[in-house]
């Protein structure tokens, strides 16, 4: 792994964003052997840290040119913000509405004397148990930044790599650069389709997700009823011609929800009932 990182900037200049790009590999289904790969952004701003999908920023640039609202969201990718030097995270989750959940996430690290050198950078090992999973991190003390991807922070240096012991998740730093001004994410991270995220508790969100599981195609059913059979109506790329078809589609959707239930924080997985 070749890192493209500038270590000559010991601190963030006023009103600037220092951006780190991480390669994120993960399994949505823990029983699968396939790993999905996406690039994620860690923005270190003067007063706040943000973590979100790289494609959101790319799409936002196009939206601004076209004067479009953001309607891009990937439910399998984490998105969060936190104040500088804080463990208080605000996570953004899209169900039928964009919600935000505030959590306090302190992480207890165990520092190791093990080190390794990658692309000229000296990395030190640390381990932790977080979110019901065991993690191994490699960090660099030359960068006086106690940050890292997702909620992982608090080490005496920037996290370059972190992975889960069962191979379900990993983050690897691949690039870093400085932006001239603080990068504004208010149109695509903290909002969806022009609407700001609504604050909700973890307990209430879990209940809503269980309710959604019980009737996952509710909105599509209403749309089909209102269409009165006019034109073609597709769900999951399947043409629907009668309400009875929704029974089979509902079962397929529920099966997918059960299978794709492998969150970063395993102890927060929704316990969907088997049909």
Features from the language model and the residues they span:
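Extracellular or lumenal secretory-pathway regions
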Residues: 16-117, 122, 136, 167-275
């Amino acid at each position: 792994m070749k890192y493209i990182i500038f270590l000559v900037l010991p601190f963030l200049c006023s009103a600037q964003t220092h951006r780190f790009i991480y390669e994120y590999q993960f399994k949505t289904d823990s029983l699968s052997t396939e790993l999905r790969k996406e690039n994620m952004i860690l923005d270190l701003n003067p007063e706040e840290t943000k973590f979100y999908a790289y494609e959101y920023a790319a799409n936002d640039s196009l939206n601004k040119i076209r004067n479009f609202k953001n309607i891009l969201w990937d439910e399998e990718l984490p998105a969060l913000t936190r104040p500088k030097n804080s463990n208080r995270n605000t996570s953004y989750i899209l169900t039928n509405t964009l919600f935000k959940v505030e959590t306090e996430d302190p992480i207890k690290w165990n520092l190791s004397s093990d080190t390794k050198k990658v692309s000229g950078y000296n990395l030190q090992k640390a381990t932790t148990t977080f979110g019901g999973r065991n993690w191994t991190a490699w960090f660099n003390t030359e960068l006086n930044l106690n940050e890292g991807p997702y909620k992982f922070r608090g080490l005496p240096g920037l996290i370059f790599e972190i992975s889960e012991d069962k191979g379900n998740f990993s983050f690897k730093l691949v690039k870093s650069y400085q932006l001239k001004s603080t990068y504004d994410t208010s149109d695509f991270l903290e909002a969806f389709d022009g609407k700001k995220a609504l604050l909700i508790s973890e307990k209430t969100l879990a209940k809503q997700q269980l309710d959604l599981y019980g009737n996952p195609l509710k909105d599509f059913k209403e749309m089909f009823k209102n269409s009165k059979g006019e034109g073609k109506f597709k769900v999951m790329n399947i043409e629907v011609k009668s309400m009875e078809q929704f029974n089979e589609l509902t079962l397929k959707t529920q099966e997918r929800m059960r299978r794709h239930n492998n969150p970063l924080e395993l102890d927060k997985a929704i316990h969907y009932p088997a049909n």
